[in-house]
Amino acid sequence: MKPVGCKESRSRQTSVAGARANYRNLVACLNKAWAPMVARAGGRFRAPSVLMFSGTVSSPCGTHSDSGPPFYCTTNDTIYMNLTQDVGNYNNYPEAYNKVWARMWMLHQFAHEYGHHVQNMVGIFPAYARIRYERATYAKELEDSRRLELQASCFSDIFIGSNRRSYPITGQSLFQWRFLIGNTIDPQHDHGAPAIHKYWAQRGWDARNPTACNTFAASSSKVQ
């Protein structure tokens, strides 16, 4: 991926307006970065919609609450960002390093959900949806889910790595990015263990090329 000179918004997610400014900035950057790559892969690029929610939100993909993560809905090409989480992460902790972590968390989460949009545009998500529910065991279904989610994170960090100089991701931002990619939680075992998530996120950052993110060709040990 070629860098597109993406810079972090000057707004902070202290409020609805601040979070919205960040989401708008990120989706514009991601559209610019991914459009040519989707076209080269034979997909039809289309910009996603972005909605933010607090409390509960209904979508064509079901009802979700702000006690859970943001999500992407393939039916309407929409990224749903958890406003309660993003604003709360920034406002609830006074330490400067925690505020940097909150900014990096929002960046990574947004780019991850956009990664699902990329998967949808190039046909990966529809293929996954067909295959997963034909698996003989629930364990295999979960493995397919981890392959999908780990690839979305790898795609996320292709973008972040490509734009690390302009954004910029340096100093405390780099420290917090490294921390968060290796300290994920996966209670349902459908997103990948922390060390595995770090492995794929780092591959995306280093390679900055989707060919490094083929989780569906990886051995089972690489998608635990």
Task: Show where each model-derived region lies.
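Short pre-active-site segment immediately N-terminal to the catalytic Zn-binding motif
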Residues: Y90-Q109, L142-R146
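A metal-dependent hydrolase signature that marks the N-terminal structural subdomain at the beginning
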Residues: M1-S67, Y72, D206-Q224
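Active-site recognition of the HExxH zinc-binding catalytic motif
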Residues: W34, M81, H108-M121, S153, ...
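Post-HExxH zinc-binding segment in Zn-dependent metallohydrolases
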Residues: A136-R165
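Long, well-structured alpha-helical subdomains associated
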Residues: I160-Q224
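Surface-exposed patches in mature extracellular/periplasmic domains of secreted proteins
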Residues: M37-M52, P126-A129, N163-Q176
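Extracytoplasmic/secreted envelope proteins and their assembly/folding machinery
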Residues: R20, R24-N31, A35, A47, ...
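Post-HEXXH active-site segment of zinc metalloproteases
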Residues: N120-S145
